């Protein structure tokens, strides 16, 4: 049997002692990450009944699950990921890469061609542990999420995206400030203490060409 690395052993110990893991299990959520979105929503009021939401990098589905509960039967939640994801009540799942035209059009069809109210992206690359590699990869995914948001968001729409500070960060924030009426940076309590992640929340979408 292969030996566990010190880092994987530390992760397991942290995971099983994590209060948010326990709470997610108690409340029937698929991941502890749901509490990050919950806190962002409480602060920024992202969802309302009837809201249309796209969740990028959705698997295993915690964020989509929470969003579906918030938008209700009159809303729509589309979960998109390259990984397979088990079905969830009130959530339409599309598997694939949204850079693929066929996948993008399947996504638009799933939401009835309507403009989107909220785009969520908790996407992250497979982490190598090397910040000089991981941060640029994360920024690339964030850029892709922003590009998609600009294609699908309706007026006054909202955008939530995971970022890691480093190369390209300030330029990204500047781009967001041009596209949204308000931009805030959030570090949810549910983010692990050792994580450098931060969330950008843009509200009041006003278009890409301002």
From Swiss-Prot:
GO terms for molecular function: rRNA (uridine-2'-O-)-methyltransferase activity. Keywords: Cytoplasm, Methyltransferase, rRNA processing, S-adenosyl-L-methionine, Transferase. Its EC number is 2.1.1.166. Its main location: cytoplasm. It holds the Pfam family FtsJ. It catalyses: uridine(2552) in 23S rRNA + S-adenosyl-L-methionine = 2'-O-methyluridine(2552) in 23S rRNA + S-adenosyl-L-homocysteine + H(+). HAMAP family: RNA_methyltr_E. This is Ribosomal RNA large subunit methyltransferase E.
